[in-house]
Amino acid sequence: MTMRHCWTAGPSSWWVLLLYVHVILARATSAPQTTATVLTGSSKDPCSSWSPAVPTKQYPALDVIWPEKEVPLNGTLTLSCTACSRFPYFSILYWLGNGSFIEHLPGRLKEGHTSREHRNTSTWLHRALVLEELSPTLRSTNFSCLFVDPGQVAQYHIILAQLWDGLKTAPSPSQETLSSHSPVSRSAGPGVA
């Protein structure tokens, strides 16, 4: 009697594959150091502009929320990232700092868990980044909220030092979106309403 072994991909295997594909895509493109506007405390509502007629133009939508007032050194700070996906079970939302995983950064900071909220034809993903003790190094770190699903990859960059310096100068924000349907598509981030 001959025994055959048939390998089937479990759910954890897909996450590893999806993360691997993301890392390849993220390293293949340059990530500009950009900031987001502090006047509203948020970039935009990630799911409000989605249209089923043109999903590749609007997905993924990504939003980052930060404190409107500068947090003093050694203070606690929470950044919140929200993404909207049409792939409820095949999407990842996570934070990076200077291109590295949060666990590799110096200082007291941690990622929250990813929560998922299913709404009609979309799924909202939420994930917080908590800086328990803001240091000069963390203040100058390029934090990136990354969102990956089978259709696209999106990154939102925020540097706290530039963000708070922007209270005086109001810089224009930007959001980088990489689509699997086009080589590199970049769109300007939300403006001040």
Swiss-Prot record:
Domain called Ig-like C2-type: residue spans: 60-161
Pfam families (UniProt xref): YLDV-IL18BP-like (PF22009)
Residues modified by glycosylation: 74, 98, 120, 142
Keyword Transmembrane on entry: no
Keyword rRNA processing attributed: no
Region (Disordered): 172-193
GO cellular component terms attached to this protein's record: extracellular region
Localization annotation: Secreted
Primary location recorded for the protein, binned into one broad class: secreted
Residues of the signal peptide: 1-28
Cross-referenced InterPro entries: Ig-like_dom (IPR007110), Ig-like_dom_sf (IPR036179), Ig-like_fold (IPR013783), IL18BP (IPR039681), IL18BP-like_dom (IPR055139)
Stretches with biased composition (Polar residues): 172-185
Cystines in this chain: 81-145
Superkingdom of the organism of origin: Eukaryota
GO biological process: T-helper 1 type immune response
Coiled-coil stretches: none
Gene Ontology MF annotations: interleukin-18 binding
Keywords, ordered alphabetically: Disulfide bond, Glycoprotein, Immunoglobulin domain, Secreted, Signal
Function: Binds to IL-18 and inhibits its activity. Functions as an inhibitor of the early TH1 cytokine response.
Protein name: Interleukin-18-binding protein
Organism name: Mus musculus (Mouse)
